[in-house]
Amino acid sequence: MDTLRMTNYIIAVVFFVCYAYQFLYIPVPWLLAKRKAAKAAALEATPHNYAVLICARNESAVIADLIGSLRSQTYDQSLLHIFVLADNCTDDTSAIARSAGATVYERFNNVQVGKGYALQTLLSHLEQDYPAGFDGYIVFDADNILDPGYIAAMNRTFSQGYDIVTSYRNSKNYGDNWISAGYALWFLRESRYLNHARSLLGTSCAVSGTGFLFSRAVLEETGPWPFHLLTEDIQFSVHEILQGRKVAFAPYSFLYLSLIHISEPTRH
């Protein structure tokens, strides 16, 4: 028992040492946010032409809400182009997305399964159908809802010269149960006390699943999304940081998503 207790103690110390530096991030937004915000406000945002990328599998219940929130953006709608990849759908996701005003592609492949392959297919279609490309590409999950100023806030940060920008994820259903509340608190910590703090300190943030933007330069370098791990967002972040790029954080780009219910199985 003494050996087991000592092993547990050593593991606990190692994990504490690995995570302790994050406590130093907590006061950073309080100390630096106003100064950085004043500098950012003095910079003029340049209008950019964006492609919105949505990969959806059997999301007929929510896809129209996301597209509706995109159409309600304060950003110039002529510079916003919505593309949906209906991935192995057995419902009417594609029809609903089309009726909501999106350009829809469909994919049926039961071997290469996952969001990474779906994004690769969607970007390959855009490469063929829109050879002029876009200034930036913004990735969302189908169950997201956006604050009306989301795209404008992302564009302000993108206009500062960053090739990759991530946003402030939040929850649509914090109070449903302890799991959704836990996820929501995690997103608060990740956005406010990790990504925001890192951005204020001039280091790189990380992309997390949904609500991120990358430039045409990134796409030209990597090709149509070669990131296929289960955690393709982390794979993408690490790859780009190793290439010398920083992932920036847009602190006022609020995105809301539904979090898992206790009665729901986790979906792959």
Task: Identify the role of each PLM range.
Residues 1-46:
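N-terminal membrane-anchoring/stem segments of glycan-assembly enzymes
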